[in-house]
């Protein structure tokens, strides 16, 4: 999904870090059409929370909290493994996001069409002495072969699946 950076209208300046109610609603309406049927209701609720935070005080911390809560709401809608009618904590949302990303990575690595393709051509070599040659890096996929083993510890059985 493409990141969206709204442009602030030239009128009243909102507190730093906060996009303003109407702007957030318009931005979500323009770019969030793939979020499903409840996107308009969620955008209206997010705009109302932002307006309430702006009206209460012009503190950047309130706007930041508003923005973070909106991000968690968006993650909850975008990740299909999160149960839609169950209350989940922010930690559980992040765990579902991590699991979903790992599932997508595995699907990409094992996709038959990608396995049959020849490797991409090597980048052009630098002229002698212009740039030192660094040793090749180990891909992250090789380092993260068993993410459950690296995360699960004796006392973490409640937090990690």
UniProtKB/Swiss-Prot annotation:
One Pfam family per UniProt: HLH
UniProt domain bHLH: residue ranges: 52-104
Disruption phenotype: Mice do not exhibit a noticeable circadian phenotype.
Keyword Endoplasmic reticulum among UniProt keywords: no
Expression induction: Expressed in a circadian manner in the suprachiasmatic nucleus (SCN) of the brain with peak levels between CT16 and CT20.
Record keywords, A-Z: Nucleus, Repressor, Transcription, Transcription regulation
SUPFAM superfamilies tied to this protein: HLH, helix-loop-helix DNA-binding domain
Keyword Phosphoprotein in annotation: no
Entry-linked Gene3D superfamilies: Helix-loop-helix DNA-binding domain
Annotated localization: Nucleus
Domain of life: Eukaryota
PROSITE patterns for this protein: BHLH
GO biological process, one term: cerebral cortex neuron differentiation
A GO molecular-function descriptor: transcription regulator inhibitor activity
Principal cellular location given in the protein's record: nucleus
InterPro entries: bHLH_dom (IPR011598), DNA-bd_prot-inh (IPR026052), HLH_DNA-bd_sf (IPR036638)
GO CC terms in record: cytoplasm; nucleoplasm; nucleus
Function: Transcriptional regulator (lacking a basic DNA binding domain) which negatively regulates the basic helix-loop-helix (bHLH) transcription factors by forming heterodimers and inhibiting their DNA binding and transcriptional activity. Implicated in regulating a variety of cellular processes, including cellular growth, senescence, differentiation, apoptosis, angiogenesis, and neoplastic transformation.
Subunit annotation: Heterodimer with other HLH proteins.
Listed name of the protein: DNA-binding protein inhibitor ID-4
Source organism of this protein record: Mus musculus (Mouse)
Name of the gene encoding the protein in the UniProt record: Id4
């Amino acid at each position: 999904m493409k990141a969206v950076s709204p442009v602030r209208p030239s009128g009243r300046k909102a507190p730093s870090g906060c996009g303003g109610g109407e702007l957030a609603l318009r931005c979500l309406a323009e770019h969030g059409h793939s979020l499903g049927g409840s996107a308009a209701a969620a955008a209206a609720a997010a705009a109302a929370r932002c307006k309430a935070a702006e009206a209460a005080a012009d503190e950047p911390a309130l706007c930041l909290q508003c923005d973070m809560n909106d991000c968690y709401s968006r993650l909850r809608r975008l990740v299909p493994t999160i149960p839609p009618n169950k209350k989940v904590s922010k930690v559980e949302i992040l765990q579902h996001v991590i699991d979903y990303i790992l599932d997508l990575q595995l699907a990409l690595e094992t996709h038959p069409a990608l396995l049959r393709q020849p490797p991409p051509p090597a980048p052009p070599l630098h002229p002698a002495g212009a740039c030192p040659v660094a040793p090749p890096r180990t891909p992250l996929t090789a380092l993260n072969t068993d993410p459950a083993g690296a995360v699960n510890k004796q006392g973490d059985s409640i937090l990690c699946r």
